[in-house]
Amino acid sequence: MDLLIVGLGNPGSNFFHTRHNVGFGLIDKLVVKHGLSLKKVKNYEYSDFNFENKRIVLIKPLTYMNLSGNIFPSVFARFYMKMTNLLIVVDNVDLPLGKCKLRKVGGTSTHNGLRSISGSLGSTKYSRLYIGVGNNNESSLRDFVLAKFSDSELKRIKNVFNFLSEEILSIDECNFENKIATINSSSF
């Protein structure tokens, strides 16, 4: 199964290492790990390569989180992919820091990036990989997700990226349930 992996985040150096940008962080990890580079077109960056006899396309939307869905008409047309190939990587404040959750389908919850994608696609029937960023419940949710990780939190998140960079490229229809078990039982 070819994979279209879209990591959500906000463009710009001021959002680097923020909780909301863990999707971008995982894409960046995969790019470095596989010696790739990102190419910029219109409203996203991408890298396209082969891994274990399948096509992998990595995407970072440049539309800001709340407009992430705007990229999909051009992405699906350019790469000849469908929703069945799609894996969205996104932050989740309902999961503890370092906990991951892979799902075949799901809702949008309070996540505006997922709402934008579901609105654009007209469906919530796409796979997603949630990366737990915790929630301190002391500040506004917006301020919390746009805040940078502390040094100790960032170390844990980098461990998550290392783990996920080994796991997600080999996801396919035959082993999706096994990957769910492996990824969902992990915690860093």
UniProtKB/Swiss-Prot annotation:
Kindly give the CDD domains that the UniProt entry links to this protein. PTH
Question: A single GO molecular function, which one?
Answer: tRNA binding
Q: Cellular component terms, GO, for this chain's entry?
A: cytoplasm
Instruction: Return the HAMAP family for the record.
Output: Pept_tRNA_hydro_bact
Site positions for Discriminates between blocked and unblocked aminoacyl-tRNA: 10
Q: PROSITE patterns per the record?
A: PEPT_TRNA_HYDROL_1, PEPT_TRNA_HYDROL_2
Name of this protein = Peptidyl-tRNA hydrolase
> What organism is recorded for this protein?
Borrelia turicatae (strain 91E135)
Q: Which GO terms describe its biological process?
A: protein quality control for misfolded or incompletely synthesized proteins; rescue of stalled ribosome
Q: Which InterPro entries match?
A: Pept_tRNA_hydro, Pept_tRNA_hydro_CS, Pept_tRNA_hydro_sf
Q: Which residues form the active site?
A: 20
Q: Which Pfam families match?
A: Pept_tRNA_hydro
